[in-house]
């Protein structure tokens, strides 16, 4: 199966490896990029992989991009399997719409997609989720396998914990809301969402 992963290369000057905990999966391996832990948890023998890396062109992202490539190499993923999606520094609507279009165009027609919305500006999660919604509607057989957020809790500058949350249920909710009609109450939609979340495949 072709599995496509989406992440944003962070702007931070210093990235520290974290052990991102997840429920019901193997113990985590320290990584600077939550998407790498998602890959460890979801890749199976025989899968074909591609990663879409959203990044601005500057010194910090160049350094962090190289670090991402190094971590991917440890998983056996080569640089040619990574496609950069350029992100201009401005946040004008036309720029973000262009980024959304570039993401949709970069997604294969037949694939399972896993997206990480941990890094990037506040607009990136909206752009990513919009691109996934559009691609699900327009692509031949595209399935969203998960939408992840890596949370790091700190106290007095010390890391207390790091967790990886799958936000796919909220993504699915937006799709369900779009199908609501007079015959469906909000309670029915939420019951369906809970059922879908309990019976989804990772």
PLM-predicted stretches and their roles:
Residues 115:
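Detector for conserved single-position "signature" residues within domains
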Residues 1-112, 133-202:
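Long, low-complexity, Lys/Arg-enriched
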């Amino acid at each position: 199966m072709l599995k496509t992963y989406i992440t944003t290369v962070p702007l931070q000057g210093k990235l520290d490896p974290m052990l991102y905990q997840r429920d019901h999966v193997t113990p985590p391996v320290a990584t600077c990029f939550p998407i790498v832990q998602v890959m460890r948890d979801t890749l199976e023998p025989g899968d074909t992989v591609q990663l879409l890396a959203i990044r601005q062109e500057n010194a910090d992202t160049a350094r962090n991009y190289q670090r991402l490539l190094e971590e991917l190499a440890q998983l056996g993923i080569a640089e040619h399997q990574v496609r950069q999606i350029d992100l201009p520094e401005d946040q004008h609507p036309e720029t973000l719409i262009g980024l959304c279009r570039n993401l949709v165009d970069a997604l294969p027609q037949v694939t399972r997609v896993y997206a990480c919305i941990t890094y990037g500006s506040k607009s990136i999660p909206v752009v990513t989720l919009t691109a996934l919604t559009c691609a699900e509607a327009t692509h031949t057989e595209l399935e969203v396998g998960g939408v992840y957020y890596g949370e790091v809790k700190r106290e007095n500058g010390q890391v207390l914990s790091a967790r990886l949350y799958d936000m796919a249920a909220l993504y699915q909710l937006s799709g369900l809301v779009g199908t609501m009609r007079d015959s469906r109450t909000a309670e029915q939609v939420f019951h369906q969402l809970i059922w879908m979340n309990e019976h989804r495949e990772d």
